[in-house]
């Protein structure tokens, strides 16, 4: 029987659109790979009603780069408040678990993040790691 451990990350409470901490029990050999983390975060957001379209989550230099698919949540179909809550939950989850990374960058299909509500440069750091 393999050892288990608990990891913490964030999701969105659909009732008040606040980010809230949740946890999942994973095998102790669960690595802090951004793609593995993204699966947990996506599943949790999907439970809250936000089906996130992720192309990839990878380390790029000192940042974690989350590349979203176009035409899906959080890029389209959300209010500004919902979109911000989803982005905050993803960014905070990444930084809390990948403590060596400096920040989180969001892109759409490898390009700058531009949605109905937000527009960020291709290398804009959305959230910086306050643990560093």
For the regions a language model picked out, list residue spans one by one.
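Bimodal "functional hotspot" detector
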Residues: 1-132
